[in-house]
């Protein structure tokens, strides 16, 4: 009963472990799906980052052109003033320079906002990529641990089966030895009864007491006979 109880308890344990293994497997699959989803979103963010970098470059180039245009007009306006050119023309140039300055101010603000967004996106993309890489590494560790534990569980199951077989064999051997001992005792008792029946048991008892002759030769008898022959 003890062995059966132990096996029953162990069986319940294995069932519980199997249920936990199923839950862990499902958990691993869910984590893998989350990682795939995160990588897909990261790819989208990467494409948005490329678009943002392109907009930053376009804004930077536009600002450069505006500044170069403003500098060129300022130089020509100074030259016009030095040559006493028609004031209306100089005023027209001044108005264009003022318009360019307003455009430059607005574009500088646009570029600043774009650069802030770019820096934030780059940090987020880098951090997310690092986290995904860490999760993937941890996932490999989880898979390796799960495989190792499954192997250990298989070994444990085999060991329990072997222990049960050994216990059964030991009990069978003990029963066999007991039956053989009982059989030998019955044979010895039968032989003793046979000796009593034909008188051999009594003769053996008298011989042990030194009464009566014995047809058996002993080493002492042989040695005494040889000594007598030598004296003759």
From Swiss-Prot:
Molecular function per GO: identical protein binding
InterPro entries noted in UniProt: PspA_VIPP1
Keyword Iron among UniProt keywords: no
Keyword Signal: yes
Key words of the record: Signal
Superkingdom of origin: Bacteria
Cleavable signal peptide: 1-18
Region called Disordered, residue ranges: 207-232
Similarity comment text for this entry: Belongs to the PspA/Vipp/IM30 family.
Protein name in UniProt: Uncharacterized protein YjfJ
Naturally occurring in which organism (per UniProt): Escherichia coli (strain K12)
Gene name, Swiss-Prot/TrEMBL: yjfJ
